[in-house]
Design a protein with these regions (language model features):
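Structured, contiguous alpha/beta core segments that scaffold functional sites
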Residues: 1-248
Length: 248
């Protein structure tokens, strides 16, 4: 006789850190599954109120009162030039990206004769991917695409040389803290908390869906061959909980 309560148990997938990989035929380095890890971080920022508040607060603390110098009185001309290059809005955005994304990028714009730097602008970090490093292990450029989630092989990419590697009028200064084992990108310092941010988001969605469904049950189990005895019902209920109530 076939066991009516024969159920299979499925373990849910576990959390993994972002994958950084070189793909044959591509000059840039992918970051995360589907090359879209920066968007994953943005989604966790938008979906978790706790994560959102922490990132906003810490980025404001990094910014503080803006960019300053301890020797501004001794070098007033250099200080004035620095303040002219780094406007407050640019610095604030860099601090925000540094906390949210773990890194940030600056567009370095030179004069026509390339005698000096005339402007520094924030570059949204999620629009950049690192070029494969040279034989010396140096990254010589970055590739720009407005939305990497829509990138397809054959789409035109804009290559921007890394700061100090070319004679072009525009370069990218890529700022990232050192992380052991990561050459191209730096994981965020809250890497271990991203799954909790996602968990908070999913719990919110779960309760919202319950409200939108009028608090109706989300699962109904029907036994076509009669009602099992209490012991069998308890075993079936326990197995259903094991299968659907979260990762182990």
């Amino acid at each position: 006789m076939k066991n009516k309560s024969d159920l299979s148990i499925v373990n849910l997938s576990t959390y993994t850190s972002p994958v950084v990989k070189e793909v044959r035929g591509k000059n840039f380095i992918e970051y995360g599954e589907d090359n879209n890890y920066f968007q994953y971080l943005i989604d966790r920022y938008n979906g978790s109120p706790t994560n959102n508040a922490i990132i906003n607060g810490v980025s404001e603390m990094i910014y503080g009162k803006g960019l300053d110098a301890t020797n501004s009185n001794k070098k007033p001309n250099e200080y004035a030039q620095m303040k002219a290059l780094f406007n407050n809005d640019c610095v604030r955005k860099l601090c925000y990206d540094l906390k949210l994304m773990g890194q940030c990028a600056v567009q370095v714009i030179y004069s026509k004769n390339r005698a000096k730097i005339v402007q520094l602008e924030h570059m949204p970090i999620e629009t950049l991917r690192a070029e494969k490093c040279n034989e010396k292990g140096e990254i010589e450029g970055y590739y720009y695409f407005s939305d990497w989630s829509k990138y397809k092989r054959g789409n035109e990419l804009k290559r921007i040389p890394a700061f100090g590697t070319s004679k072009e009028g525009l370069e990218i200064l890529y700022i990232k803290p050192y992380r052991a084992g990561f050459k191209y990108y730096s994981p965020v310092d809250y890497q271990g908390g991203t799954q909790y941010a996602e968990l908070e988001e999913e719990i919110s969605n779960f309760h919202l869906n319950n409200i939108l469904n009028g608090l109706a049950p989300s699962m109904l189990i029907n036994f076509n061959n009669g009602t099992p005895d209490p012991e069998q019902r308890e075993m079936i209920e326990r197995r259903i909980y094991e299968k659907f109530s979260g990762s182990s």
